[in-house]
Amino acid sequence: SVILPAGAIYDGQQYGLASLTATALKHGTKNMSKAQLEEELDFIGASVNTYASKESAGLSAKFATKDADKVLNIVKDVLLNPVFDAKEFEKEKQRTLVGLEQAKESPRSVIDDYYSGMLYAGHVYANPVSGRSSTVGKISVDDVKKFYKSFYMPNGAAIAVVGDFKTGDMKAKLTSLFSNWAKGTAPTDVANKPISNPTGAQVLLVNKDDARETTFYIGGPGIKRSNPDFVAVEVINTILGGRFTSW
């Protein structure tokens, strides 16, 4: 897997841009069309997926050990040589818009965005990862190309590989594959901005007359990952309510 600092916090006012950019990586490369890419992976039973989250974007791959060379070359091609085909992008944008409309029918699908929007109002952590219909509809393939050029670089990127291989050989292989990945200007740390803590209790009610279920969140600002108690707090949180089997 490859992870980069290219998540939704860098969307600016173009909510959904990081997500669309990550998805568009698989729309073909300078060496393979989207169809050829999918056929190559299907033939060997491998997969390559892309994603964007709040803070990061990335690419993950699953494949048999014997196919490592082939798939790693595909990973490199997808990450470094995307063409951002305009027709495929428009199709993806329409699918995203349909998905955003469908999500409105399920409270649990949208509550994260409502909650983050209230808790982190005025901060980049309030940015909705999938975007909003009003912003996604205005994003162009040129916007995606610009975002890719600005944020898809080795600065701050990390590559992790788990499987049956010799560490030295794999390290040499990855170094060779990505040695020409050009560095750029590291993005500004837009998240390094104070978050205003609520001065009192806040309640946000979102009514949907035909809803068959009610979903609610209760919470507040947590601690920084750099806090020495972060892991302990995560464990306690998981015990109390972090999983289906929690109390």
Range-by-range predicted roles:
Residues 1-12, 30-67, 90, 99-156, ...:
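Non-catalytic beta-strand/loop surface segments
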Residues 11-14, 69-72, 86-87, 172, ...:
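Solvent-exposed, non-transmembrane alpha-helical starts
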Residues 15-29:
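Active-site SXXK
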Residues 77-86, 177-185:
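A common structural junction motif
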Residues 164:
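Carbohydrate-associated surface elements
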